[in-house]
Amino acid sequence: MDNFQALYDYVQKLSGKMLSAEEKRVFIAHFKPKKIRKRQYFLQEGDVCKYTGFIVKGAAKTFTVDEKGHEHILKLSIENWWLADFESFYKLTPSRFNIEALEDMEILQITHNLVEEFIKPIPAFSAMQNVLSQNNTIAAQKRMQSSISQTGEERFQELVNDYPHFIQPFPQNLIAS
């Protein structure tokens, strides 16, 4: 399956809407394939997040480093997930996070301006964004609640139960963090 087919399938599945041939051509014209090597950064703290990327292959971590040099992982991302510091991407402000490839990755990336001008008007993409926004809000609430009410071991077990496919690409110490 080519890179774009993975994106089409994802958008159509989440939105419940089919993409027309013309809409697919718009995607091809504006999303750019990019390869990111293991340990290479998609985004570094202090830089403005100019792109969002759809992960076709690979995995990444979003993290910050405290004043003592300790790494704090905020998010792990796998195939068919989006990469970006969305605050930086939408507000064009310096990022507070790093996004690093944990293995060789293939992504389809696009700029904020191109999303707004060409992609957002596509009904399936807009519907997909709404579903993602809802899912992200729910996930953030669940994560906050679990950090207050569950032990690390309980949170890990819930992750294994809810997302068994998610565990494979990552070492346990990353997931535990």
Report the location of each language-model feature.
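Glycine- and acidic-residue-biased ligand/ion/polar-headgroup-sensing regions
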Residues: 39, 50-63, 79-80
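Phosphate-/nucleic-acid-contacting segments
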Residues: 150-177
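Short, Lys/Arg-enriched, Trp-marked, Pro/Gly-tolerant hinge/linker segments that flank
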Residues: 140-151
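Cyclic-nucleotide recognition modules
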Residues: 73-130, 134
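Cyclic nucleotide-binding regulatory module and flanking cytosolic helices
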Residues: 1-32, 88
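Short alpha-helix-to-loop micro-motif enriched in aromatics/charged/Gly
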Residues: 68-72
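Short phosphate-coordinating micro-motif centered on Lys-Gly-acidic
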Residues: 42-47
